[in-house]
Amino acid sequence: MSIHFPFSIARPITRVIAAAACVVALLPAASRAADLLDPRSLTVAADVPAKQARAQILAARRYGTFWNTGDATLARTALAADFVDRTLPAGREQGVAGPLAASSTMRAAIPDLHCDIEQMIVAGDRVVVHLHFRGHFTGTFNATTGSGQSIDFIATDIYRIDHGRIAENWHIEDNLTLMRQLGLVG
């Protein structure tokens, strides 16, 4: 006796596997958690629920990886649509457009710009990150063209995370060191 099914059981499973493979293949490589920067040191306050901590860490890792790669998709994923820069530098546009423009400017001057997350601290709805930037000034910044000099400076950011995205950012960069390395100040 033979039993016939109106459809093959293997066909739906094959379709699911094929669909999943397509989705993974279409994702930008750095959008997968395994491809994001890991902090060298991570401290999470004991009173932060695990699910909340994971979402906050993911947003901060995406944003750190954006600074490391220049991948605008990561910034758009990490930042809330109504993102506010609370320490907005003069001339920088408010909102998501601000960091995108800043990254483009930095990469025009320092094409091999690399960022590490040295420390990350999660407390309440805040994440504090200590970033370390390195590269070589081989491009142009304002009217100055680099001659390959090394760039090595730090920044510290405080993010307020809302619904898994960075809603606000307070940041300070060691701009004096950066400007000296660029040869713009003595």
Which sequence ranges carry the predicted segments?
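A solvent-exposed, acidic/Ser-Thr-rich amphipathic alpha-helical stretch
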Residues: L58, A72-G124
